[in-house]
Structures are given as structure tokens and as C-alpha cells.
Amino acid sequence: MANDSPDFFPADDMDAFPKGAIKAIVEPIDDVVDFSSDIWSSSQTLNDSFVFNGKHYVAAIDVRPQYVCAYNTKTISDFCYDDPAELYANDEWTWSKFTEMCLDFADSEADRYALDGYWYGKALNDTCGYPLIGLEDGKLVNNMGKAEVGTVQDLMYNLEKNNVVFDRSSNNWKTRGDGANGEGLGSQLTLFIPIGTWALEDTPEKTKTFGSVKDGEVMFVPMPRMDDSDKYYVSTGVNGYLLCKNAPNPDGFNAFVNCCKVANSEVQNITEEQLKNDYDWTDDMIEMRKTIYDLARQNPVFDFQDGVSAELSTLMQTVNQATMITGGGATTWTECVAENQKAVDYIIKEANANVAE
């Protein structure tokens, strides 16, 4: 088996593509994987989302929703709010409703804040349907100047200015308490935490900060839709693989990803059984997880800001938190664009132009 390794690695972190293609670290796989075959036909659109410079680089098995809007059902009930899950079922889970609940719940004197976590900036931005850094026609694009992005960022800025966000600047830039995921939901001091389902896909001991999963206190929904949209967009990652440059066994890579693709539905079934039997998930949680995966397949928002270069990732940290950073540092989106758009444009232009062969 010497020198017979497939030499591939996961694309799940969204930090290796298109960087790997730009630097010739990974191979295009159009001549390795038959995306027109029956095995891959159901995910043709997904795989086409990872075309760079005219070539496929990611063997995308399935989507991976990045964020959900987690909440505590007891808090919703005690404050006489409409359950977000019911609002979603009735297609009424909108930015207006979300904002209304956030403004009503927040009370700094009572130490209540509507939003906490590390990812609400990205999660909320993507509800407009556009990532800050996207791919169009096989090229990177900077969407900071999109009107839709400006609209949602203005909504985000207004939330922060109305003091609905927990002030991480006063807590050593950690979330409430010691920074544990879910802190504040179980104690009913936080209304919503945008976070990945991975934080809830764990033992009751690990998820107790959110509330009691077994007793039905923990629930989640997609992030709200824009009022003028008929779609719930989902910040989306990928479950997939990249092939290393000059890998000695591309056939082995092809065999592996084909097996992963064929087994994917059974993997999902096994995961759901574990969630129910080991992690105490309710039927409502299982069904909502399925719903959000379906939404991610239908309305994905893939952001490539961490997959280009360290320089862009660092710059986008500033951009991502511009309108919602706590501690008095928030700026309007207009100011953020004026200060950062040209620098982002330059990095994107260089990345598109300097693709290694």
C-alpha cells in the first residue's frame, strides 16, 4: 500500500477553498469524479457552487447549515411571545417579528439581552441572500456594495444601537458568564443565540446551559427571513473533500467520495437515532433539523471570506462585526463600506488573477 494514499482532506471548515486552488495545493477533480453520474446527479447544483476558474475542486457530499437561531421555549412562554417554530410554520418568522421580540425582551437593568454568541453578525447578514464574499461564474466577488447587504446591515446596526446585544467587550470579549455555548438561554437572560446545531448535538451535560433538552425547553429555527423576501436563506457550509495536488491515487479518492455520497442518507438516519437516543432530542427538534437541512439545500448562502487568504480573513473580521460590535465601537454600514471596500476589492482582484497552474 506504499505510495497508494488518496491524499485528500475535508472541505468542511470552508477555509481551504478556493485558497487551495489559488496556490495549487489542491487538484481540480472534473477528470476524477463523474458529476454527471446517477450517484452525483442529486447534488449537481451544490457541486457547481464550488467551481473556481471553470473547474470543480470540492466533492460535495451534502450541505452543512452553519447557524440556527436557538432559543428556550420556557422563556418564550413566560414572556408570552409567539413561538418562533410556529411563526416559521406559518411563514411569519420575519425580521420585523424577530426585531419586535428582541426590542421587547432586552432590559440592561435586568441583565437581559436578546442576542448573544460569536456568530450573530454572519448569521444575520446572510438572511439577505448574499454572502459578503461569494462566488459567481467561477470567480470571487465582493458583495459589500449590494443593496440587499446594506439593507440587512442597517437592521443589524439598529439592533445594536437599541442595546439588545450582550456586551462582550465588558466580559473579556466572551459571551455571557464564562463564555460557554448557550450560557444565558437556560437562565432566561438571553432570548436568541445564533449558533451551529453542533452545539446542541451533544450530551445533556454539555447542553444544559441552553436548558433541558429532554423537557422540551430547547428549540431552534432558521434565522428570520427578510420581510420583502419569500425565502429563508441559510448560512451554509459543506460536507465534502478536496484532492491534494499530484495525489498518487485519484481513483482511491473517487472511490471514497462515491461511497460517502451513496451512504449519506443512511449516515443521516444514524445521526438522528443518536440525537434521539443519546442526546434526548425531541421529535420537534429532529424535524426542524431536517427542515433546516432542506432549506440549506434550496437556499444556501456560501461565504468564502475565510477561504482566500489570511489577509482577507483578518480584514473581514473587522467588516463582519462593524455594525454590531459592542462597547460603543459599532459603525454604520455606509462607514464600513467606505473604510474597507477598496481593500477587499483589491484582495479579491488579486486572488482571481493569480491562480497558480
Regions found by a protein language model. Give the residues of each.
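Short helix-initiation/N-cap motifs at beta->coil->alpha
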Residues: 1, 92-97, 168-186
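Early extracytoplasmic/lumenal segment of secretory-pathway proteins
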Residues: 1-14
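Hinge/lid segment of periplasmic solute-binding proteins
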Residues: 11-67, 96, 221
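Short, solvent-exposed loop/beta-turn-alpha elements that line the ligand-binding surface or hinge
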Residues: 30-42, 87-91, 130-151, 210, ...
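Extracytoplasmic/periplasmic solute-binding protein
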Residues: 51-69, 77, 94-142
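Glycine-centered hinge/linker elements that transmit conformational signals in sensory
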Residues: 99-102, 137-176
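Extracytoplasmic/periplasmic substrate-recognition and gating elements
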Residues: 209-279
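Conserved C-terminal helix/tail region of periplasmic/extracytoplasmic solute-binding proteins
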Residues: 245-254, 262-357
